[in-house]
């Protein structure tokens, strides 16, 4: 079995598999595509949906101290002025004078193993020309509301979901009667006009965030910061991500955002190297105090036990759903020798697998199909299923392995003529067991639980 530390060439295999099997398609492909923009296909939409549901379950449903929110993508421009995004949500842009390609200066420095640009001459990676001096480029997309395109109608597409939580802090307190410490979670689209998007779905201009703002008493923030770092790392491990492919990296002081007291990234070893998967930040009381000052609305929390008003400090775990889906896809990918061929398997955790169980009649013989469809109808009410009767049973097993289906249920001639039982095949071991059709749902549930599922 090969290592899952994929080489650069193997990323091509991931992208090819993603398109061929319906995980991710290039967007607008019939018109030549549009850079770093992707559409999720039938399996990809299920994978990302399962990732989001796993996150929501762990953050909201299984906790008493976190509630949900879904705020608007377009908000008052004053929100982004108060938050600092209008003035400071920028990246350093450099341009090649000959080929006119644009790059992020900090990314070029990082590739050189440097952290500061002083005294460094940056050259174009393509033609070697000396790049321009960096200028700051605001990443927010502008648009206009209403029929008149003037300054009064200008708005921005949100670059993060967090601010929608902060401006609703008091609304949530009043509606839910929550007491500090508590959190507000949100999943939604955000938009950043990235200078150099890339690495497939890792960095795109339109992406989906899963963010939670956890409000704590000042002075207790360090303990909660440590708690959420450990909790979020464990979430990935619980979904089957290999421990050696994960690490924590604390930001150095010069890396910290203007609002942050501390920040730590959960990094994943992607084919191109270590990159941020999730960030956990101590945002202090910056956001609530800034919005109170700008809006004139009181956003301090009244602590009844202390008889004191204060702005809570905020611990923020922020994860991109697209990055999470990519990491899980890469981590699941395995190539195993199988005689003279290579067996490609996606060893997804069963709770995020797009299909949990496939029902496969041994052939398309008319006598098998009604029973196979009956078994499928019973299973699809309880699990994510797929019915497949095209091509040989061996090819169908391979196809299900390649999309990450944990279990396959095969209906054969003995099922209809002899024992009224089916064969259940395990993706990881390829072991097969015979189970009466009356017990197939329980057997599938037991099989999925044996692979780590919580069904």
Residue ranges of each PLM-predicted region?
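NTP/phosphate- and nucleic-acid-binding module
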Residues: 1-455
């Amino acid at each position: 079995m090969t290592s899952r530390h994929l080489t650069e060439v193997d990323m091509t295999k991931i992208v090819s598999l993603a398109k061929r099997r319906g995980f991710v398609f290039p967007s607008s492909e019939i018109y030549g595509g549009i850079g770093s923009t992707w559409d999720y296909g039938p399996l990809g939409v299920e994978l990302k949906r399962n990732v989001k549901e796993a996150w929501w379950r762990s953050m909201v449903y299984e906790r008493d101290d976190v509630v949900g929110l879904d705020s608007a993508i377009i908000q008052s421009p004053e929100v982004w002025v108060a938050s600092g995004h209008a003035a400071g949500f920028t990246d350093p842009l450099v341009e090649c004078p000959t080929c006119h390609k644009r790059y992020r200066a900090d990314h070029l420095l990082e590739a050189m193993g440097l952290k500061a640009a002083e005294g460094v001459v940056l050259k174009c990676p393509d033609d070697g020309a000396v790049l321009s001096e960096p200028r700051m480029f605001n990443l927010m997309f502008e648009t206009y509301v209403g029929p008149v395109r003037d300054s009064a109608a200008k708005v921005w597409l949100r670059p993060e979901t967090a601010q929608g939580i902060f401006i609703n802090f008091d609304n949530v307190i009043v509606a839910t009667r929550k007491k500090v410490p508590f959190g507000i979670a949100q999943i939604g689209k955000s938009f950043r006009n990235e200078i150099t998007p890339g690495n497939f779905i890792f960095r795109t201009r339109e992406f989906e965030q899963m963010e939670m703002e956890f409000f704590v008493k000042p002075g207790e923030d360090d303990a909660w910061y440590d708690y959420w770092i450990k909790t979020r790392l464990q979430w990935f491990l619980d979904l089957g991500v290999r421990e050696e492919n994960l690490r924590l990296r604390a930001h150095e002081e010069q890396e910290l955002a203007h609002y942050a007291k501390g920040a730590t990234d959960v990094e994943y070893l992607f084919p191109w190297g270590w990159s941020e998967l999730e960030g956990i930040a101590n945002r202090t009381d910056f956001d609530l105090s800034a919005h109170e000052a700008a809006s004139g609305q009181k956003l301090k929390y009244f602590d009844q036990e202390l008889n004191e008003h204060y702005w809570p400090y905020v611990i923020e775990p922020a994860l991109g759903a697209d990055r999470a889906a990519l990491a899980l896809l890469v981590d699941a990918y395995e190539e195993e020798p199988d005689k003279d061929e290579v067996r490609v398997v996606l060893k997804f955790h069963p709770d995020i697998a797009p299909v949990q169980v496939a029902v496969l009649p041994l052939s398309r013989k008319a006598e098998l199909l009604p029973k196979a469809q009956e078994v499928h109808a019973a299973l699809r009410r309880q699990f994510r299923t797929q019915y497949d009767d095209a091509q040989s049973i061996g090819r169908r097993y391979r196809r299900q392995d390649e999309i990450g289906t944990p279990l396959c249920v095969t209906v054969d001639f003995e099922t209809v003529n002899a024992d009224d039982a089916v064969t259940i095949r395990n993706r990881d071991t390829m072991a097969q067991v015979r189970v009466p059709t009356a017990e197939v749902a329980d057997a599938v549930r037991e099989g999925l639980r044996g692979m780590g599922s919580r069904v």
